[in-house]
Amino acid sequence: MSGFKQHTGLVVPLDAANVDTDAIIPKQFLQKVSRLGFGKHLFHDWRFLDDVGEQPNPEFVMNAPRYQGASILLARENFGCGSSREHAPWALADYGIKAMIAPSFADIFYGNSINNQMVPVRLTEQEVDEIFQFVEANEGAEVEVDLEANVVRANGKEYGFEIDSFRRHCLLNGLDNIGLTLQHEDKIAEYEANIPSFLS
């Protein structure tokens, strides 16, 4: 993984609270264990009027022409609640989402997003309101998420955010759980070479 330092992108404003993982990726699409291919099913029951994903719902914000190509998702509190399915961040990442901004995220979803190199940014409700107003009033509005400086830049303003230092390190350096383990590959090899024969 390449790591996340700064990203500037088009924002799609999903004005909904308590969006659960079943809404993000419905259960009928959870049959694969590969991370790829889930983007087309993202918010399926909201994005489409049919069961097979061929009739877009013109009322759903992500289908609006002005938000096509969005790479930052703006939402309300408790985003990603519900079951712990990792397919939810897989679907968002496969769709092209690089960062999410909301007042709060469900804990397991928050961790799973970081493991998949997406930055979940927690801002206050007032700050999120301001960004909603900016994005909805300005077609093509872009926002910058700067993980090195721990700020979001929008409409000439800077909004500071906090993130655990270990998780920030993983995001900046593109490290998932496997990558973290491989950082200690030499020590693992040394340990394995010294295991007594009766334990091997």
UniProtKB/Swiss-Prot annotation:
The UniProt GO MF terms for this protein read:
3-isopropylmalate dehydratase activity
Please give the pathway this protein is involved in.
Amino-acid biosynthesis; L-leucine biosynthesis; L-leucine from 3-methyl-2-oxobutanoate: step 2/4
**What EC number(s) are associated with this protein in UniProt?**
4.2.1.33
Going by the UniProt record, its keywords in alphabetical order are: Amino-acid biosynthesis, Branched-chain amino acid biosynthesis, Leucine biosynthesis, Lyase
Tell me what reaction this enzyme catalyses. (2R,3S)-3-isopropylmalate = (2S)-2-isopropylmalate
Q: Which InterPro entries match?
A: 3-IsopropMal_deHydase_ssu (IPR004431), Aconitase/3IPM_dehydase_swvl (IPR015928), AconitaseA/IPMdHydase_ssu_swvl (IPR000573), IPMI_Swivel (IPR033940), LeuD (IPR050075)
Q: Which domain of life is it from?
A: Bacteria
Q: Name one Pfam family in it.
A: Aconitase_C
Q: A cellular component term (GO) from this record?
A: 3-isopropylmalate dehydratase complex
- Name its GO BP terms in alphabetical order: L-leucine biosynthetic process
Q: What does the subunit comment say?
A: Heterodimer of LeuC and LeuD.
Q: Which family would the database say this protein is a member of?
A: Belongs to the LeuD family. LeuD type 1 subfamily.
What does it do? Catalyzes the isomerization between 2-isopropylmalate and 3-isopropylmalate, via the formation of 2-isopropylmaleate.
Report the NCBIfam families cross-referenced here.
leuD, PRK01641.1
| Name the UniProt record assigns to this protein | 3-isopropylmalate dehydratase small subunit
Native organism is Vibrio campbellii (strain ATCC BAA-1116)
